[in-house]
Amino acid sequence: MKNSGKLVSFLVPIISILLAFVIGCIIMAVLGANPFVALESLWIGAFGSLRNVGTTLARSTPLIFTSLCACFAYRCGVFNLGGEGQFLMGSIVCCYIATQSGIEGLPAILLCLVGGAVAGGVWSLIAGLLKVYRGQNEMIITIMLNYVATLFMGVVYTNWLRDGSVPQTQAVPDATQLSRLFGLRVTSAFAIALVVGLLVYYFLFYTSKGFQLRAVGLNMTAAEFNGFSVKKYILMSFIVSGAIAGLGGSAELLGTQFRLINGFGNGYGFDGVAMALIGQLHPLATILVAIFFAALRVGSTTMQAATGVPTSVSDIIQALVIVFTVAGLAMVKLPGFKAFLGRLTERRKEAA
């Protein structure tokens, strides 16, 4: 019964992706395009050459950070919807250090990354403290903090660190920018994201603290009864998840954008939440989901150029994947579905 449930949960995202592509192909056919040619051009645009692969991995990097942020928090049973705000606060502190400290090179890079992580963690901790000590709903608080961070970033690039007459900040010095990998668009920020993902995976599944954090997420009352400090782990989850998002903001600034401007980091936070859910809160799975979504976004441009299918079709496919996955996982947890799986398992045992 338990193994059958795990298998079904594993298959839900895969089936959701297939269904989303089937509907996407129907839409392409209605628009007068050949779905197979369109899908081929989508694949070529995302993975058809080393250059395209580099672009896909570069686009996936911020998504990996924000999805890991959501994954870590949700494992502790708290809903951190403030990944975007924490991402922005990390990038703001990183931008200030990179452009105003006078330090360049590797020391500046390390200082920027650490500063961004600290900023994201502190920004997230605000919601954690309000939840633990005042009983406030963390979802509402983190969403509100997203707006505050966005407005604060606007002040930064229009006034505080503005570069001349253009509403944008000064650019990160060349010596402080992250290096490209193999001459492609993807930078060492992607490598940092992978390392963070592996560290999160190791911590959650191979350390006693990670086990206790997951136990708190499964049942806070039972965890507290067994002597676990629930408040401590809730605060830890907010700090670490915020630090991951803040580190992502720093890496995005140093590796891809190089300056703050209107629209920087827009949507990354909620995209990360969706990808964490599709990856079923598994750190390594969320990395693959982030790369998949980035591939859809990068490949859609080539698909439009080759077949005339608008890039919005790719957006529809992404939305359908999210809807089908969430609906499927919710259905799997229904008592009736669990009972059906139990009867099916018993029949298989009897047949054997």
Predicted regions and their residues:
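Transmembrane alpha-helical segments in multi-pass inner-membrane proteins
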Residues: I239, I244-A251, G255-A319
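Cytosolic-side transmembrane-helix boundaries in multi-pass membrane proteins
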Residues: M1-I17, L218, F225-K232, S300-A352
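Short, non-helical or kinked segments that cap or interrupt transmembrane helices
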Residues: A33-V37, Y74-S91, V132-I141, Q212, ...
